[in-house]
Amino acid sequence: MYALYFILVVVLCCIMMSTTVAHKMKEHIPFFEDMCKGIKAGDTCEKLVGYSAVYRVCFGMACFFFIFCLLTLKINNSKSCRAHIHNGFWFFKLLLLGAMCSGAFFIPDQDTFLNAWRYVGAVGGFLFIGIQLLLLVEFAHKWNKNWTAGTASNKLWYASLALVTLIMYSIATGGLVLMAVFYTQKDGCMENKILLGVNGGLCVLISLVAISPCVQNRQPHSGLLQSGVISCYVTYLTFSALSSKPAEVVLDEHGKNVTICVPDFGQDLYRDENLVTILGTSLLIGCILYSCLTSTTRSSSDALQGRYAAPELEIARCCFCFSPGGEDTEEQQQGKEGPRVIYDEKKGTVYIYSYFHFVFFLASLYVMMTVTNWFNYESANIESFFSGSWSIFWVKMASCWICVLLYLCTLVAPLCCPTREFSV
């Protein structure tokens, strides 16, 4: 239900940022101007659209999740009174969310509020990105560690490691080559060439560091699989950043405007702007929601706190993200004759409630900054969101470099602090 609330508010924010929807409402809703004046939203409801309206709505949603984050601190049993607040009262929660989003429009001194809230949103958005990058690095280490544990009993795991590593590096190399072909030209596109060279060099660097003797002595499980996963993600972020970069327009020898440094076939993808907007917005919502849900599991919160399973307890399996099938619990055994019921929260919560709400709190800020085009908020609208902007470009490039830095830290930290115990 929390995910449904989140989706409803995100869709509302996208509608508020759509100039097309605003014009359609003005054309087709009778007495539109009278209604806008009646609710004191301006002559054409300008207070209910644009980046300032999105800031207010996301402020209400962020406060909603932050309050529940505080209310659910230190809950270890799903039968406690405060746990019922988290797991029930859905109708009243919906009313509370609506009241908080609406109440944000009545905050006095709106200019000061919007300026201050913008910086809070930027910090929260970057924290949300940081959590995703940390979990990606942890995922790469966990994958290699789990499959390496299987080599002790079955040598076929070596072949699996080699095959997946080869696939990862093939994808990363192929992606960089294709971007060099389609996003650069013989004359010009120097920025794209530099960025591709830098990011390609970073992929080579992390690969060499991962297999260097000094790192191997401290971390025997370090290998090319982790660096291959990170290299693939760096390649993806590089492609995403170049795709988000504003098009460069120059004059050709005939005095006509020509767009350079983008694929020729990319021009046709933006002809139907409504289709691009709908598909792009749906993909954006889906990715953010997936990031929220995968970031709020018990294993992810344990990983962020540095708690991992002991190496001797690792059981190699293809689907290593899921717990291995063990013996039936008492409840499962009793239910074999009838429906199988698993009481997954009988002895404790399967995820940390407060951490769950905190991630959604950060996601609210990330949505606010993303939908309003980060620092180009004044000219932002959802129709031009996918045509590219410098703010989104540099956010993605910064995410790419931070991801590499985080991975390098996991490799180098044991060398810099030999007396400390590092477990990945």
UniProtKB/Swiss-Prot annotation:
Organism: Macaca fascicularis
Function statement: Restriction factor required to restrict infectivity of gammaretroviruses: acts by inhibiting an early step of viral infection. Impairs the penetration of the viral particle into the cytoplasm. Non-ATP-dependent, non-specific lipid transporter for phosphatidylserine, phosphatidylcholine, and phosphatidylethanolamine. Functions as a scramblase that flips lipids in both directions across the membrane. Phospholipid scrambling results in gammaretroviral surface exposure of phosphatidylserine and loss of membrane asymmetry, which leads to loss of infectivity.
Chief localization: membrane
Pfam families listed in its UniProt record: Serinc (PF03348)
Residues exposed to the Cytoplasmic side: 24-52, 109-119, 183-193, 243-274, 370-391
Keywords: Antiviral defense, Cell membrane, Glycoprotein, Immunity, Innate immunity, Lipid biosynthesis, Lipid metabolism, Membrane, Phospholipid biosynthesis, Phospholipid metabolism, Transmembrane, Transmembrane helix
GO BP term (any one): phospholipid biosynthetic process
Subcellular location: Cell membrane
Membrane topology category: Multi-pass membrane protein
Record GO terms (molecular function): phospholipid scramblase activity
Extracellular side: 1-6, 74-87, 141-161, 215-221, 296-348, 413-424
InterPro entries given in the database record: TDE1/TMS (IPR005016)
Gene Ontology, cellular component aspect: plasma membrane
Glycosylation sites noted in the Swiss-Prot or TrEMBL record: N76, N146
Family of this protein: Belongs to the TDE1 family.
PANTHER family from the UniProt entry: SERINE INCORPORATOR, SERINE INCORPORATOR 5
Catalytic activity of the protein: a 1,2-diacyl-sn-glycero-3-phospho-L-serine(in) = a 1,2-diacyl-sn-glycero-3-phospho-L-serine(out); a 1,2-diacyl-sn-glycero-3-phosphocholine(in) = a 1,2-diacyl-sn-glycero-3-phosphocholine(out); a 1,2-diacyl-sn-glycero-3-phosphoethanolamine(in) = a 1,2-diacyl-sn-glycero-3-phosphoethanolamine(out)
Positions of transmembrane segments: 7-23, 53-73, 88-108, 120-140, 162-182, 194-214, 222-242, 275-295, 349-369, 392-412
Protein name as it appears in the record: Serine incorporator 5
